[in-house]
């Protein structure tokens, strides 16, 4: 918590920067930095049927449309295009006007602008002790749609045809346009004083004074480009925040318990089809770096989706869906691990890393650590299943594969340019670099490892359980 002096200084700064905050839902910013364009594979228009609106929602829908008109988000249209409206309830029970843009999206040339990796975004917060999360007031609606492309956004309603002047949700390239906007606005501040992931902006600092300066910098930049924040959604001067499905603090990163809580509900109703299992594994996989040996645990479940380790669906049709006791144990173990995950530490690239590796007959395991204040902190876990060919490797070659995969693939971003101590329970692996008896493929793997600075040490298998 802030002391009395800090509160006064924070209030004074917020008062100076009050123009960055929207005063109500209709108080939208309008950026001059980018416009959203819609390039189509062919310009031939289409017209979809107006969908029926339940009579009880008609009056509410009309009010919502009028609000959009008053805000300048939409205007009446004579467009030859027409996409149907979909009405959705918000969390506060008010009506959101959405549009089914699937037909338009199918004709849209995709924008390849990259969206940041979640892991990179979170790791940029290393060393920070204070955080502020900023949320834009209907962020997409602060971006203009190019005038020539506005007719393509036309929506058909019981009250007529309207087109968007601002970028609506549902357009296939809207996320790319918004990420481009935010990175342009905060270009020299991104990853230095704040991180940007779509409409999530996190300002981070080591102390209050630094935060005050950084926050004002970000506010000034948003004002410069005509963007406004939603005050109720902004969290300022926090020591612990929720960000991208995780909880972030000075101690490290952990899964957001509110996000993983639904996993417990799955215990009462295990997946009954391949589709349900894919949904579960997709959700669980988002947090796989928190689970030691995720791939090995999930292997019985993965086998239900593919007939073999290699996904050759044409040669090997999908097996029948039979939920065995082995599947149930794997399912329960994953849920238990995900709902009691460790806090992962932030990497410090000024310190060496410690990499524990191991290989079994089914998969590879790796655990990345660093020592800080005489304590060993987990940075990340990694694992993957072996292919059919890899399962035929000798034990030594599987360990060599685990070394190459762990350093040159899984944790490359951490280990390139930093010292790494590799711990293995394979004694022959410790003689790898000096051995004269290497096959041509061994030499290729060794060449891939050459740019990395690592030392291999041996530890007996009984005390080597963390990478298994």
What are the roles of these predicted feature ranges?
Residues 1-113, 194-198, 205, 245, ...:
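Reverse-transcribing Pol proteins
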Residues 4-25, 49-80, 112-125, 130, ...:
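Inter-domain linker/hinge segments that demarcate the starts of reverse transcriptase
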Residues 17, 37-38, 68, 85, ...:
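Mobile genetic element proteins and their domesticated derivatives, centered on retroelements
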Residues 19-49, 57, 88-96, 113, ...:
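Reverse-transcriptase-like RNA-dependent polymerase core
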Residues 88-96, 104-111, 141-144, 182, ...:
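Catalytic palm subdomain of template-directed nucleic-acid polymerases
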Residues 105, 160-177, 268, 318-319, ...:
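A short, polar/acidic, helix/strand-boundary loop motif
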Residues 192, 197, 223, 232-351:
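C-terminal reverse transcriptase regions that engage the nucleic-acid substrate
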Residues 279, 285, 392-468:
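RNase H-like nuclease module associated with reverse transcription
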